[in-house]
Regions:
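Feature activates predominantly on carbohydrate-active enzymes
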Residues: 51-54, 58-60, 96-304, 314-316, ...
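Extended, loop-rich substrate-binding clefts of extracytoplasmic carbohydrate-active enzymes
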Residues: 257, 611-613, 658-715, 805-815
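Catalytic domains of carbohydrate-active enzymes that cleave complex glycans
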Residues: 416, 443-605, 825-836, 840-841, ...
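Acidic (Asp/Glu-rich), glycine- and aromatic
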Residues: 631-633, 710-754
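Short carbohydrate-recognition loop motifs
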Residues: 689-690, 877-897
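Extracellular carbohydrate recognition and processing domains
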Residues: 941-976
Length: 1002
């Protein structure tokens, strides 16, 4: 904030007739009476009219005296509070330089027997009134629901002479509660998202707000006839998760026309966003890339495009600015190109560490950001910041960034920034300390060099009352952990973060217990304390639950572990507080709070079960777990013939039983989806239920599960339909895990094939192999002499491609799987599959062989064992004749997510044995510059990397498989292999993985 020094003001004031030093104070009110009137101009702006009303109202609440409000038509009275630049003020020798105040600045000054509060007509006078009430009379507006309006019998003001002009022209604390109009106005936040109307001074107005390229040139309108308007990627024009061709003259022309139309349609808007889409894939055409090469950054085509639009509207719309982003691949500034004076560049901090101040931290991305803000300051006169202040994966999660809020805002202001958007938990109430964070940010945005600890303590005292000391200790507890251990913190922080160590949570709970006791007699304050506690309760609920080493079971119509009473009580308290607060979301864009409730309820009470039953058979289905069948009971033998998995199995309880996925991987789309279930119309004639789910990728899965009324026969009829408007590439895979007794004792039989024991080779601990299309016919039979039972399986389906079988040396499960071909499925078309399972006797079962000892010299995972993140968007499976099994997984080179992962089972390895991990990988290569990909192994239990590295594009050959060595270590539980592209899509459009394998180290 620009503070005009008091001594200078005092000298000016003495010269022009303001109250002399030592003059008696102004008594605005005394015992419910006042000699003052509030005077405003007869032509006052809407915000000045509102300011007069607010001043009158709050003075009455404070003192009991209701001051009259008058226009400035008559003579000056004996004692006036003069608001705004009115006729009465103009009769005084006030010495106030109105020109320096702008739209939002103000001066509060005693001039003779009068109090003057004057500022910009738009918002300045109103801000002056609120600042007077706050700084002189002690009013506070902590949140939309909590304020402090002190009571005073006598109001005296003396020596007041203060001018404030904000450094930042745009100030937005983007939190859910901060959208309230009164809160925003009273805390001087001119947020574009707040519900600010004209009487509250309006706001900074954007249209549209961000990521607008496809608003500007909609693909639905243009792509079919003009694909050249969109990104050229790998020689093909695309509008799928891409950008515009910004050097195409027609795109420039259409962009100018669209912006002019937006200005006509929205005459009050002062900022038009022309900004990249929220994805990668900038255009690779020669013209766009020539600018990139000349300026050394992908920001060059964007800025060149934006400059042309800005030039076109500069004369006709001089009050409108064009806003764009320096974000992700466009964050680095150009070498020489300058932004036009009517261009705003919004620099985004998304990659930075948010637990250490940007100005001083040595984290690489923070250092890089410092370079970028200095660079953009040399190329742009009007720079804004898009900053991030919470975990967007977990709005409820403790996010100790209090050490950086004020220092970062001051750092921005010191580097010429003129507007700041502080993105927080904007979608729901109840997020972690969001009211406090919004309040503190509002104060820092108005005065970047404010005493932030004083602001925090003031809020804590006013908001939490007697619990304030404990709340202060709680905040310091987390900050000290982050600071002392130098823990970096990012915007997708999760419940396993190292600052949420067990000892920290134990102490936090002790502090909250003490805080709740301190305000036990104040229900509203107690609720606020309990809302603040939601964060550590959320961590406990997500990390805890019933004993993880207890297998799930079906009891009382639900499937889950034995209940944990303490966990259930915690969940009950958590949801009671959250429901009272109105929490609706805990993760940006979803899942919503009801998803969390279902997940926590499932942990504490289990998942609902649908049961089908006849005299011979009982089938147990869990719709919430991908429609998984966890029970196939032979009632005569009281034996469950499916293996539903067990604690320790990767993904448990989302593994085992009968499952389906629309992917090469059984961890793909649909595998863990929450299905809805309804009974069939056949009723008792054929007991059954229909499971269905709409997946976000435009696919629908439907499954009819039914049993014969009398015989032990289960039928599963599945259909995967493409409900999207365009073709979708997918496959339908099913897997039935059967429990046939001790490992390696099951007999496998098929028509025209001699029965054989299905065993694992001695040098391995797992065998997975295809038995079809070579399979000579159906049904396939698995027989168990140990259990005295057999299972007969028949599979039919459209495009049925392969049938496979898998067995392990360390668990009884024997898997039978069927997959369709991977193909483009037209809109409205579908893939189908039908599996029939009949229970039989064990006739023909072979006797078990001798006990076998298994080594694990090599442990291999083909791509069908991978998990793909955002499959179909950032990663996918492809048929590749050069891959070892004809398939590979690939990930988009313009991204940086760990989108290919293999969560391996530690039982596949010999205990306490070192292995070297390798990956068969290749790239599509367009150039030698930069990295090709990163790789590593992550230990989730210890929240630490095990090994890792990267490969450079220059060291790899286009479309040639190469072996990458990851490292040598002892594989353990809760570890996974990952690969990630290096956000270098121009040079490496795709990264491929054929397989991973471990070799026993010498």
């Amino acid at each position: 904030m620009k503070h005009i020094p008091f001594l200078v003001l005092a000298a000016i004031s003495a010269a022009v007739g303001s109250a002399p030093a030592g003059a008696a104070p102004l008594v605005l009110a005394d015992r419910g009476r006042s000699d003052f009137v509030i005077v405003r101009s007869a032509a006052a702006s809407p915000s000045e009219v509102h300011a007069a009303d607010e001043l009158q109202s709050f003075l009455e609440q404070i003192s009991g005296a209701k001051l009259p409000i008058r226009a400035d038509a008559g003579p000056v009275g004996a004692h006036e509070i003069m608001l705004g630049n009115n006729a009465h003020l103009q009769t005084l020798q006030h010495g106030i330089n109105l020109d320096v105040l702008g739209d939002e600045g103000f001066t509060m000054r005693i001039v003779g027997p009068h109090l003057v509060i004057v500022g910009g007509r738009l918002r300045g006078t109103m801000y002056g009134v609120y600042t007077f009430l706050e700084e002189q009379l002690g009013c506070r507006w902590y949140s939309s629901k909590v304020s402090r309006i002190p009571k005073r019998e006598r109001i005296e003001i003396e020596g007041l002479d203060d001018t404030q002009v904000p450094v930042l022209e745009y100030r937005e604390p983007f939190e859910f509660d901060s959208f309230d109009a009164d809160w925003a106005a009273r805390n001087k936040a001119n947020s574009q998202s707040a519900r600010l109307d004209e009487q509250r001074g309006g706001k900074v107005t954007y249209f549209p707000f961000v990521h607008t390229f496809y608003n500007l040139i909609p693909p639905d309108e243009f792509f079919a006839t003009h694909p050249e308007y969109y990104s050229l990627i790998n020689g093909q024009r695309t509008c799928d998760a891409a950008q515009l061709c910004l050097t195409n003259p027609d795109v420039v022309r259409l962009g100018i026309e669209r912006v002019r139309q937006w200005i006509r349609d929205h005459p009050d808007v002062r900022i038009i966003s022309v900004s990249q889409n929220d994805c990668g894939n900038p255009c690779q055409c020669p013209n766009c890339q020539a600018l990139v090469q000349a300026e050394g950054t992908e920001a060059a085509p964007v800025l060149n495009f934006v400059n042309q639009i800005a030039d076109a509207i500069a004369d006709e719309s001089p009050n409108v600015a064009i806003d764009t982003l320096a974000y992700s691949y466009t964050r680095h500034p150009p070498r020489t190109m300058q932004a036009r004076p009517n261009v705003i560049v919004r620099l985004c901090t998304i990659e930075c560490c948010f637990s250490h101040p940007l100005a001083t931290d040595d984290y690489a991305q923070n250092v890089s950001f410092r370079d970028d803000i200095v660079g953009w300051g040399q190329h742009c006169r009007r720079m804004y910041i898009w900053d991030y202040v919470c975990s967007f994966a977990n709005y409820l999660l403790p996010f100790p960034n209090w050490d950086v809020l004020q220092p970062n805002i001051e750092f921005f202001a010191n580097n010429g920034v003129r507007g700041i958007f502080e993105e927080g938990a904007y979608q729901s109430p109840g997020s972690e300390l969001e009211e406090m964070r919004a309040y503190v940010m509002a104060k820092c945005l108005w005065q970047p060099d404010c005493d932030v600890k004083a602001v925090e303590d003031d809020f804590l005292q006013g908001y939490y009352g007697a619990a304030a000391p404990m709340m202060r200790d709680y905040i310091d507890l987390l900050e000290n952990k982050v600071r002392d251990d130098h823990i970096h913190m990012f915007i997708w922080a999760g419940v396993g973060e190292p600052y949420l160590a067990d000892e920290v949570l134990t102490e936090a709970n002790r502090l909250f217990d003490e805080a709740e006791r301190a305000v036990a007699g104040e229900p509203d304050v107690l609720h606020r304390v309990k809302v603040a506690r939601l964060g550590i309760q959320y961590v406990a609920l997500q990390r805890g639950g019933p004993a993880q080493d207890e297998p799930y079971r079906v009891a009382d119509g639900r499937y889950g572990p034995p209940p944990d009473d303490a966990y259930t009580r915690l969940a009950t308290d958590f949801f009671a507080t959250a429901d009272r607060e109105g929490v609706t979301l805990f993760h940006e864009g979803g899942p919503n709070f009801e998803d969390l409730r279902r997940a926590i309820t499932a942990k504490s009470a289990g998942h609902p079960v649908v049961t089908l039953e006849n005299p011979r058979l009982r089938v147990e289905i869990v719709p919430d777990l991908g429609g998984r069948i966890v029970g196939l009971w032979d009632k005569e033998r009281n034996a469950n013939l499916v293996d539903p998995g067990a604690p320790g199995d990767p993904g448990y309880p989302n593994c085992g039983g009968y499952q389906e996925a629309l992917s090469r991987s059984l961890r793909g789309p649909g595998a863990t989806a929450e299905y809805t279930a309804r009974p069939t119309n056949e009723g008792a004639d054929r007991p059954g239920c229909v499971l269905s789910v709409e997946l976000p990728n435009g696919l629908r899965l439907e499954r009819l599960v039914s049993i014969d009324p009398q015989e032990p026969v289960l039928t599963i009829e599945s259909a995967a339909t493409n409900t999207a408007a365009e073709p979708r590439r997918f496959m339908l895979q099913s897997d039935l895990a059967l429990n046939m007794g001790a490992p390696e004792t099951a007999t496998f039989a098929a028509p025209n094939m001699p029965p054989e024991l299905f065993v694992v080779p001695p040098e391995q601990r797992q065998v997975a192999e295809w038995v079809a299309p070579e399979l000579p016919g159906w049904p396939v039979r698995l027989l168990s002499r140990e259990r005295g039972v057999g299972v007969e399986v028949t599979v039919e389906g459209s495009d049925l491609y392969r049938v496979g079988r898998t067995a392990y040396s360390f668990q009884p499960a024997v898997h039978l799987g069927a997959v369709s071909a991977l193909r483009e499925v037209p809109a409205g078309d579908r893939l189908t599959q039908k599996m029939t399972v009949r229970l039989t006797d064990a006739a023909g079962a072979l006797p078990p062989g001798p006990a076998r000892q298994h080594q694990a010299d090599v442990v291999e995972a083909q791509d069908d064992q991978f998990s793909l993140y955002r499959e179909g968007e950032l990663s996918e499976f492809v048929q590749d004749p050069t891959a070892s099994d004809g398939f590979a997984a690939r990930q988009l080179g313009s991204d940086i997510e760990w989108s290919i992962q293999w969560n391996y089972d530690p039982r596949l390895f010999e205990p306490d044995t070192r292995y070297t991990l390798y990956g068969a990988m290749k790239i599509d290569k367009q150039g030698d510059a930069g990295k090709a990909f990163d790789f590593g192994v992550y230990d989730s239990a210890n929240a630490a990397g095990v090994c890792g590295g990267s490969r450079n594009a220059a060291d790899l050959t286009d479309d040639q498989w190469t072996t990458t060595e990851f490292g040598t270590f002892v594989p353990g539980p809760q570890q996974y292999v990952w690969t990630a592209p290096a956000r270098n899509g121009d040079n490496v459009p795709w990264v491929y993985v054929d397989r991973f394998w471990f070799e026993k180290a010498e």
